[in-house]
């Protein structure tokens, strides 16, 4: 897909690709200088942000809003639009009580696709810059974006969504269901004046919608923004251990595959495997650390005589370890594994609450976040994040041994190191200054 015009999917998606080029007046054979490539990416992102903002503000007047949700407030709409446009997927709202089905699909899920495709396109352009010798161009952003969406993301998402539906993930356009409780519940409420009242709840609202189609791209594109507030801990997003396994595989699928792409495009497959191996070693070290401390349980509970050992006898079952904030159907292993994967990949999807981890168990997810996407990382971003680290390492190693630093046959010059350091400092600068 990156360096060949034909794939085995060309018969299916080729006509669609050519139609998109014709409608958008894109010359697929025209390549762009890095400045034009960057400008196209920024322009596409800004337009996408404005469209998503408008969708949220006009939500009440648009179709596929069976619950009649009002338009999203201006500040929240901008927050959400900028978040999903940049593949951040930070959420300051509950999806099931704020967003209509149309906004979830045409707005949020759409940006799950194109933000991921943008990241992959930038990674491919980065690799082209390393692999090419004399060329002054890096490819065509519009072609890379289109092909990534059609030939990579869409096929995997179609298959993945069907697999998730088979496991019980919801996919419909039905209004929320009002279910009568078998046993009414008494709920104590406090009004603005501090007066307490007791309300009897007899009906439960069961939220639903086109979840499976958004869930798979949420993981495959390392987006992370959930259809429901509970994210992948919600049984309608992630009902079974097998769906949990599929979603974890999806998170790492593209980021790990891009290391192979690196080897193929540079003509040095051993180097691609070396990068992959470095990522795997760091990932496994993180996972086993999280699992060890979570399986041991909370030491404070031990002081109070609370049993945290696994029990399955005399009709009693207990998973063991620190189960606070974790789903029983996943247990310690799947929760620790998911926490490591999602923070390695900057995905943001969760199947347990990381704040409820033990201090040392929760340290690893926090460390993964602070590393800035080098252990597989987000789709595209993880690869070029690791490559930046490699450039800096090669440069420092060259200084130590007194040799001119080279990477894949190219000299590492002062301007290259300056750009690499700029990449590193922007991350720290953004956190320190804006906090």
Where are the predicted features?
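Selective recognition of specific alpha-helical transmembrane segments in multi-pass small-molecule
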Residues: 41-55, 147-170, 254, 270-297, ...
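Long hydrophobic segments that form regular secondary structure
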Residues: 242-273, 280-281, 346-418
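N-terminal alpha-helical transmembrane segments of multi-pass membrane transport
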Residues: 1-79, 123-124, 131-139, 143-184, ...
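Hydrophobic alpha-helical transmembrane segments of multi-pass membrane proteins
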Residues: 42-46, 106-117, 126, 149, ...
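Mid-bilayer segments of alpha-helical transmembrane spans in multi-pass integral membrane proteins
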Residues: 77-89, 109-121, 125, 153
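Transmembrane helix-loop junctions in multi-pass membrane proteins
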Residues: 51-61, 131-135, 163-174, 232-238, ...
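P-loop potassium selectivity filter motif centered on the GYG triad
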Residues: 60-108, 170-249, 304-381
């Amino acid at each position: 897909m990156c360096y060949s015009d034909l794939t085995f999917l060309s018969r299916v998606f080729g006509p669609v690709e050519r139609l998109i080029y014709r409608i958008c007046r894109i010359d697929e054979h025209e390549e762009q200088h890095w400045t034009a490539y960057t400008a196209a990416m920024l322009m596409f992102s800004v337009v996408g942000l404005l469209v998503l903002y408008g969708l949220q503000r006009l939500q009440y007047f648009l179709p596929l809003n069976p619950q009649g949700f009002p338009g999203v407030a201006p500040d929240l709409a901008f927050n959400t639009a900028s978040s999903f446009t940049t593949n951040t997927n930070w959420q300051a709202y509950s999806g099931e009580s704020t967003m209509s089905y149309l906004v979830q699909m045409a707005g949020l899920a759409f940006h799950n696709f194109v933000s991921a495709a943008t990241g992959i396109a930038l990674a491919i352009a980065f690799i082209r810059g390393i692999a090419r010798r004399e060329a002054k161009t890096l490819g065509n952003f519009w072609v890379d974006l289109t092909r990534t969406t059609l030939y990579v993301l869409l096929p995997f998402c179609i298959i993945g969504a069907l697999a998730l539906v088979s496991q019980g993930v919801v996919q419909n356009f039905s209004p929320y269901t009002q279910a009568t409780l078998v046993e009414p519940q008494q709920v104590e409420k406090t009004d603005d004046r501090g007066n307490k009242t007791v309300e009897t709840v007899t009906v439960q609202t069961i939220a639903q919608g086109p979840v499976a189609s958004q869930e798979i791209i949420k993981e495959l594109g390392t987006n992370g923004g959930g259809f429901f507030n509970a994210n992948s801990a919600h049984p309608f997003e992630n009902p079974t251990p097998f769906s949990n396994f599929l979603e974890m595989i999806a998170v790492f699928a593209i980021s790990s595959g891009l290391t192979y792409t690196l080897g193929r495009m540079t003509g040095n497959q051993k180097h691609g495997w070396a990068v992959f191996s470095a990522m795997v070693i760091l990932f496994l070290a993180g996972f086993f650390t999280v699992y060890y401390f979570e399986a041991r349980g909370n030491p404070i509970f031990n002081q109070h005589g609370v049993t945290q050992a696994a029990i399955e006898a005399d009709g009693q079952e207990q998973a063991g370890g620190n189960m606070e904030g974790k789903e029983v159907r996943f247990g310690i292993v799947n929760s620790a594994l998911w926490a490591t994967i999602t923070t390695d990949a900057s995905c943001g999807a969760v199947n347990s609450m990381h704040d409820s981890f033990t201090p040392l168990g929760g340290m690893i997810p926090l460390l993964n976040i602070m590393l800035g996407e080098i252990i597989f990382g987000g789709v595209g971003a993880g690869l070029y994040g690791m490559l930046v680290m490699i450039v800096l390492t090669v440069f420092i190693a060259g200084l130590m041994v007194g040799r001119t630093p080279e990477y894949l046959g190219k000299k590492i010059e002062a301007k290259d190191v300056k750009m690499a350091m700029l990449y590193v400092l922007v991350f720290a600068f953004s956190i320190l200054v804006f906090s």
